[in-house]
Design a protein with these regions (language model features):
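Acidic pyrophosphate-coordinating catalytic loop
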Residues: 79-113, 124-125
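Active-site beta-strand termini and strand-to-loop segments that position acidic
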Residues: 19-23, 32, 119-121
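Conserved Nudix-box catalytic region and its N-terminal flanking loop in Nudix hydrolases
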Residues: 23-87
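A conserved hydrophobic position in a structured secondary element of the catalytic/binding core
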Residues: 20, 43, 183
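Short, P/G- and charge-enriched loop/turn segments at secondary-structure junctions
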Residues: 1-7, 94-107, 166-169
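Conserved beta-strand and immediately adjacent loop positions that scaffold enzyme active sites
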Residues: 16, 26, 179
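Acidic, metal-coordinating catalytic segment for phosphate/diphosphate chemistry
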Residues: 1-16, 20
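Nudix hydrolase/Nudix homology domain
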Residues: 36-40, 110, 114-116, 120-216
Length: 216
């Protein structure tokens, strides 16, 4: 733990997501060439827009960088946030961040604070509702329904369904070079680097998805 203070002009807040396709037990990772032309892998992330909710910002960045629409997935993760009043006996499922990462931004005193969330790809019906033209303003999806179990969620897709991938969702020249891949959890961890925070986000997300299945 640390104590630190940053003024508004030196602080940038962002969010990232591990986007799971639950039915096929796969997760979305992105890739891009580094300065040496070699491919590296990462989870989609970025700064939230001014006035934007942090969770919505994470979903939007996930969509823009990967091309996969997504929504945060409520899971039985451990966290330190208090429950809303009146409190219930059993802790509810929440979509709280599973990791917080702090990084210097450029040179000087600027600080980047990044929250990592767990999300899922959208069912076919929502993809139709949210369809927009390339370059149009981002349209956020509705939240995951409280009463929808994961098993019933999986049944919303026909067997062998492939989540819809959207082209041209990047908002600048750099993001236009990004490629996305829907891979197994093990392959994602290997490509992200087993000791890095992004691999741990994937691991924790998949563990809690399995935990929720067991609870239901």
């Amino acid at each position: 733990p640390l104590i630190a203070q940053f003024s508004d002009e030196d602080l940038v807040v962002g969010g990232g997501v591990a986007i799971f396709h639950i039915a096929s037990q796969r997760v979305v990772i992105c890739s891009a060439p580094d300065r040496r032309g070699e491919k590296y892998y990462f989870l989609p992330k970025g700064r939230r827009d001014a006035g934007e909710d942090s969770r919505t910002g994470a979903e939007r960045e996930g969509y823009e960088e990967s091309g996969y629409r997504n929504r945060l997935l409520p899971l039985p993760t451990k966290h330190r946030q208090p429950q809303a009043h009146p409190r219930v006996d059993s802790p509810p499922l929440t979509a709280e961040p599973v990791w917080m990462q702090m990084m210097p931004l450029g040179y000087g005193s600027k600080q980047y604070v990044l929250y990592w969330y767990i999300a899922e790809t959208l069912p076919p019906g929502l993809e139709v509702e949210l369809e927009t033209e390339v370059g149009a303003a981002y349209k956020p999806p509705p939240a995951y329904p409280h009463s929808l179990t994961l098993r019933d969620r999986v049944k919303m897709e026909p067997e062998g369904y492939e989540p819809l991938h959207h082209e041209g969702t990047g908002v600048d020249e750099e993001e236009a070079t990004y490629e996305s891949h829907l891979v197994s959890v093990e392959e994602a961890i290997k490509k992200l680097g087993r000791t890095g925070v992004m691999a741990d986000v994937v691991l924790k997300g998949w563990k809690e998805i399995q935990h929720r299945f067991a609870m239901e």
